[in-house]
Amino acid sequence: AGVGAGAEVIVPPFTYIASVEAVIFAGGIPVFAEIDETLCLSAEGIRKAITPKTKAVVLVHMCGQMANMDEILKVVKEHNLVLVEDAGQAFSATYKGTSVGLFGKTGCYSFDFFKIATAGEGGVFVTNDEQCYKFADSFSDHGHDHVGSNRGMEQHPVLGFNYRISELHAAVGAAQTRKVPHIKTVNRSHKQLMMDRLKGIPGVGFAAIPDPAGDSATFLNLMLPDQAAAARVVEEFGKQGVSGFNYWFINMYHFINQWGHLKDLKSAAPLPAHHYQRPQDYNKLSLPKSQEVVGRLISFGIRCTWKESEVIELTNKIKTSIEKAMGVTAYA
């Protein structure tokens, strides 16, 4: 995306940490912006984080959902920024008929074991920019240009690393991807059943989905009234034997509160970020909206292998736990 030493890149504080590490190892300076109830960067948050040095935005579509693309694209175009999408957690999600990951200059998807389609490891990079494609193709394989049939005689237009996915992982990923439409259909049915049975609990809602028709339904994202209520519910889940959820607020990998090593930029060797002035002190960040949203969020991963009876049993346990923790009774 053209990001180099000292370029500022707007990133979310709620994402898998690799999204931010990529900026650092490209020589850029991460600048954290606020998310909103979509669980993704907000247009307002992006706008407030822009400086004359801002080069790009890394937009992460979290928890199976999508960002409000119309509003974000307006800001990106207005300020002539490069949009990079991370749809690792939202493969198969769409916004007004277009797959997330296809709005920016580049996009990526994950085949990690936790995703809707898995190859065990690896992922996919997409772009409509030919120059960007050729650069990525070479960069991912020690700079090889892959021209001709003799690997030993290939040219190296750029320096690169080894980010190759193996043939075995790629074959598994291709096979699994063909199953995604079926998985998505089943997941959406499970999620709707869970939402119907939980929507009557006073004070409990769901994360905002800008385009419900495009939801990948890989997660059920519950929003509690506040952080204290969420903590009580999580504690009650433990007592009731409810599992399969993430309370991201204390998650070591997905929320900035636990990223002490990143805040201190701990690395094996000096990085460009050590030598350039940063617009934010990562240890003194003020992101009240993000803290409020993630503090209230509890997400359940949805599995297409569940039987309807299992969905109902789990949902009943969730409902009972929330009612007990919050001292409320669901509406009929």
Q: Which functions belong to the PLM regions below?
A:
Residues 14-20:
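Conserved coil-to-alpha-helix start sites within the AMP-binding
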Residues 11-12, 29-38:
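Short beta-strand->loop structural element characteristic of the AMP-binding/adenylate-forming
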Residues 1-8, 22-25, 31-32, 98:
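Phosphate-binding glycine-rich loop
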Residues 90-96, 103-219:
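Active-site region of PLP-dependent enzymes
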Residues 37-119, 124-126, 131:
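Active-site phosphate-binding strand-loop segment of PLP-dependent enzymes
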Residues 130, 225-229, 307:
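Helix N-cap motif at beta-to-alpha junctions
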Residues 143-152, 193-198, 234-298, 327-332:
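Conserved PLP cofactor-binding pocket of PLP-dependent enzymes
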